[in-house]
């Protein structure tokens, strides 16, 4: 592992922090991701670890192309949902999956358009609320 590597930490209720010096110092990400936001999912792109997706609690997805220094919102129909999981297809990184509550969404064009996926979960659940908490693409 390199001597200086970047660490991103997503929190519940305190946004995201980034360290560019292996955890020695930290900076809070403040814009455009609110500092009180909950970050529920972080995923790097398999072909470029400097590209990162962040799933939030009610603000949709954000993307960074520079190792977490700058972020932009990803326009999608899930902007007001809790994004619990994010996956990127290693064979085609334009294909992105986002797990919400209880359904999932897929983009085949890098996040420009999205399709809702029927994954068999329903909102009716005897205990708790169903959520798509993990997604893996083979």
Can you describe what each PLM-predicted range is?
Residues 1-138:
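Extracellular glycan-interacting surfaces
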């Amino acid at each position: 592992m390199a001597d200086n590597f970047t660490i991103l930490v997503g929190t519940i209720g305190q946004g995201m922090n980034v360290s560019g010096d292996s955890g020695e110092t930290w900076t809070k990400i403040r814009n455009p991701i609110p500092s009180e936001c909950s970050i529920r999912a972080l995923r790097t792109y398999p072909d470029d670890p400097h590209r990162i997706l962040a799933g939030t609690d009610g603000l949709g997805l954000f993307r960074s192309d520079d190792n977490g220094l700058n972020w932009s919102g990803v326009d999608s129909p899930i902007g007001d949902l809790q994004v619990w999981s994010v996956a990127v297809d290693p064979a085609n990184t334009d294909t992105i999956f986002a797990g919400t509550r209880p359904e999932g969404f897929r983009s085949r064009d890098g996040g420009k358009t999205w399709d809702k996926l029927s994954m068999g979960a329903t909102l009716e659940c005897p205990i708790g609320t169903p959520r798509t908490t993990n997604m893996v693409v083979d």
